[in-house]
């Protein structure tokens, strides 16, 4: 029988981002308890030799699996060293690859307090309304007028440590033009 290949979209990331992601996930699973129901799988619990960790995030009847890899083909720069992340959405027997922004949006829909379009209706019904969003990485579009008004009223408080963002984990830092300065410290040059 011939070899069968399976192609998986893997976002090339810095190994320090993977360490930060893992520590943030563990903190919010075990210390702050904001990531209830999340499951962390260590590298020694996986059958695949290139998988360094897995985070299973339940979303009602579906699951989001964020899998980090090591020992992949080395990148263009020294610090990339073959580390990557894949994001998979599973529901029963169906699974598909998704991008980091969609993953953040899905996490935002099911976890963490947020001021949303339904907040005015909740306030009229006498329910508690959260005036801020705990997971701003999940907002990938311009907010509603009510959300923007609430944001202007409430001063944002920085969360320490921040909530884990898949978009931040898989952010492309290498292809952005680097800002450099000439010998007189004038920001006239752009990557040259």
From Swiss-Prot:
Residues 14-17, 74-79 are annotated as: Interaction with host APOBEC3F. The record marks 150-151 as: Cleavage in virion (by viral protease). It comes from Human immunodeficiency virus type 1 group M subtype G (isolate 92NG083). Belongs to the primate lentivirus group Vif protein family. Processed in virion by the viral protease. Transmembrane segments: none annotated. This is Virion infectivity factor. It comes from the Viruses. One of its GO terms (molecular function) is metal ion binding. Residues 158-192 are annotated as: Disordered. A motif (HCCH motif) lies at residues 108-139. GO terms for biological process: viral life cycle. One of its GO terms (cellular component) is virion component. The BC-like-box motif mediates the interaction with elongin BC complex. Residues 75-114 are annotated as: RNA-binding. Counteracts the innate antiviral activity of host APOBEC3F and APOBEC3G by promoting their ubiquitination and degradation. Acts as a substrate recognition component of an E3 ubiquitin-protein ligase complex: mechanistically, Vif hijacks a host cullin-5-RING E3 ubiquitin-protein ligase complex (ECS complex) and the transcription coactivator CBFB/CBF-beta to form an active E3 ubiquitin-protein ligase complex that targets APOBEC3G and APOBEC3F for polyubiquitination, leading to their degradation by the proteasome. It is a peripheral membrane protein. InterPro entries: Vif. Homomultimer; in vitro and presumably in vivo. Interacts with viral RNA and Pr55Gag precursor; these interactions mediate Vif incorporation into the virion. Interacts with the viral reverse transcriptase. Forms cullin-5-RING E3 ubiquitin-protein ligase complex (ECS complex) by interacting with host CUL5, RBX2, elongin BC complex (ELOB and ELOC) and CBFB/CBF-beta. Within the ECS complex, Vif interacts directly with host CUL5, ELOC and APOBEC (APOBEC3F and APOBEC3G) substrates. Residues 171-172 are annotated as: Membrane association.
